[in-house]
Amino acid sequence: MAGNSIGQVFTVTTCGESHGAGLLAIVDGVPPGLALSEADLQIDLDRRKPGTSKYSTQRRESDEVEIISGVFEGKTTGTSIGLLIRNTNQKSKDYGEIKDTFRPGHADYTYSMKYGFRDYRGGGRSSARETAMRVAAGAIAKKYLLERLGVQIRGHVTQIGHEYSDVLNSSTIDWDFVNSNPFFCADADAVSRFETLIDSLRREGTSCGARLEIIASGVPVGLGEPVFDRLDADIAHAMMSINAVKGVEIGDGMAVAGQFGHSSRDEMTPDGFTANHAGGILGGISSGQDIRVSIALKPTSSITTAGKSINTEGEAIEMLTKGRHDPCVGVRATPIAEAMLAIVLLDHYLRHRGQNADIKQPVQSIT
């Protein structure tokens, strides 16, 4: 039924709409004793929040999160953690003209056909506004993974429209620079090209897609539950649940179709793997190498160029989208994708620990 939850041991359930009173999350399965404050969650929320850059939507939300349960005297209690973010900058009047029409490329038509009714204000539940709660919940997972396991999750944008970043080797990425520019890009030259492209998109009344990579380093060997809950399957599921994502690749992804077995099989030596074409996952189980995930996001359909559609009477119309929108939704997607990867990894770690905590590995890990 309703798909508002993710995870089996570490679970996240969210609710809330773009123009509702606020957003809520229940985060369950967090081990007790983790030092946690609202400031810990706010770091990633500030990276995602709208209105912080001229290259994203101009809707301004503080996205200040409140922890309403599950934390006492600065530590998690082991009970469910309740999170709340209040909406403060809705402009629902921007959407009054479209309540009887379907915006092309949006979920308006499918939500209406599925439920027989929809919240037309900013897309309601289908809006990317709901991802704020994913980021808040994911920040909890990221903190646990880093502090207890040494797992670090970081992302960077590799493409916006027809412009590409030339810095793709994770060992050479300056992560401080990535987090200091509005595009989460590792290539200083590409940042200026991205700026020029976004400015031109605004003038032309259109938008573009994007591609980004998320890397998890320090992941222990053994995470993943074959066969239906393979780690890469659950990662792909989590990434595809993000608004506008139309493609997910693990490791070399689609490029493996043009490779040969003798060069793509990630050979092993006592000193470690010789390559990482598989993206840190073999047989659906983490190998201990970096987990590399790439996602592609489509151009936002909310643009100021008129397009064909229909209204609720089934009549042909031409409509122009109004409101405040991102010319490229990929600009703010990096912390969202990081959060989703963290949620999946913590869930799988806790599942693995529950079943295999006393397993003695037959050989020493080579990573």
Curated annotation (Swiss-Prot):
Molecular function via GO: chorismate synthase activity; FMN binding
Keywords linked to the UniProt accession: Amino-acid biosynthesis, Aromatic amino acid biosynthesis, FAD, Flavoprotein, FMN, Lyase, NADP
Stretches assigned to coiled coil: none
CDD domains, sorted: Chorismate_synthase
Gene Ontology CC: cytosol
Lineage top rank: taxon: Bacteria
Signal peptide: none
Catalysed reactions, as listed in the record: 5-O-(1-carboxyvinyl)-3-phosphoshikimate = chorismate + phosphate
Annotated positions binding NADP(+): 48
EC number: 4.2.3.5
Cofactor(s) needed for function: FMNH2
Keyword Flavoprotein on entry: yes
Any matching Pfam family: Chorismate_synt
Keyword check for Hydrolase: no
Pathway assigned to this chain's UniProt record: Metabolic intermediate biosynthesis; chorismate biosynthesis; chorismate from D-erythrose 4-phosphate and phosphoenolpyruvate: step 7/7
Protein's GO biological process: amino acid biosynthetic process; aromatic amino acid family biosynthetic process; chorismate biosynthetic process
Cofactor binding note: Reduced FMN (FMNH(2)).
Principal EC category: lyase
Positions with a binding annotation for FMN: 125-127, 243-244, 283, 298-302, 324
Family: Belongs to the chorismate synthase family.
Oligomer and partners: Homotetramer.
Protein purpose: This reaction introduces a second double bond into the aromatic ring system.
UniProt protein name: Chorismate synthase
Organism: Psychrobacter cryohalolentis (strain ATCC BAA-1226 / DSM 17306 / VKM B-2378 / K5)
Gene name in the database record: aroC
